[in-house]
């Protein structure tokens, strides 16, 4: 299963490291990543592969939400199919 993860918040040291380390702990592979800083705001979108994940999708969602709170950013995850359906032009 592939999923899209978005991260948005005020820029500070450790956001990418914090998100990527928790994904690695859950055996989630980052297939593609794009990040940008817009003035003082950090934005990142990742395409991930959960096929080897050691936890359920709901657990991944919970863990990312908790990590986001610790980092002071919003982290959202969506199934790639749902993301594509919602963002089709």
Curated annotation (Swiss-Prot):
Gene3D superfamilies: 3.30.70.260. It holds the Pfam family ACT_6. Residues 4-78 form the ACT domain. It comes from the Bacteria. InterPro entries: ACT-like_dom_sf (IPR045865), ACT_dom (IPR002912), UPF0237/GcvR_regulator (IPR050990), UPF0237_ACT (IPR022986). Belongs to the UPF0237 family. HAMAP family: UPF0237 (MF_01054). NCBIfam families: PRK00194.1 (NF001220). This is UPF0237 protein CA_C0478. It comes from Clostridium acetobutylicum (strain ATCC 824 / DSM 792 / JCM 1419 / IAM 19013 / LMG 5710 / NBRC 13948 / NRRL B-527 / VKM B-1787 / 2291 / W). The lineage of its organism: Bacteria, Bacillati, Bacillota, Clostridia, Eubacteriales.
